[in-house]
Regions:
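N-terminal, charge-rich interaction modules
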Residues: 1-15
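Short histidine/acidic/glycine/proline-rich micro-motifs that form metal-
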Residues: 11-13, 46, 72-76
């Protein structure tokens, strides 16, 4: 089974935000992949100028079968440009990968499995 890449915002880099609950959910979601025997990598970025380059580098690390884009990037209206750029980066650097969207970090495995079918 091809590896999966999870792309999201680094909760510890969001000003005025308590990262603990999201970090716990990310860890729980990662454990679900491990328990399912699926190779998974995580790319968490800050909302800054380096985000796109970091994501592009992560996308080129392996031939990912699925890339899951987290809600932190996808949902806020003020991040729509970043979301569009992430989709373009996936298409450019991992054209073989299916694109999936989770509802929260714990559902990332479910999202990836929907696209693995």
């Amino acid at each position: 089974m091809a590896p999966v890449l999870l792309i999201g915002l680094d909760p510890s880099k969001i000003p005025g935000f308590d990262p603990a609950p999201v970090e716990l959910a990310i860890a729980m979601g990662h454990k679900r992949f491990v328990d399912a025997g699926i190779d998974v990598d995580t790319c968490l970025v800050a909302i800054d100028a380096a985000a796109r380059a970091i994501i592009a580098e992560a996308l080129q690390a392996k031939p990912y079968g699925v890339v899951v884009v987290g809600g932190g990037i996808r949902k806020p209206d003020d991040l729509v440009e970043l979301f569009e750029d992430v989709i373009a980066l996936i298409r450019r650097h991992a054209p073989q990968a299916a694109i999936a969207f989770n509802t929260n970090p714990v559902t990332s495995l479910d999202a990836a499995q929907r696209r693995m079918r």
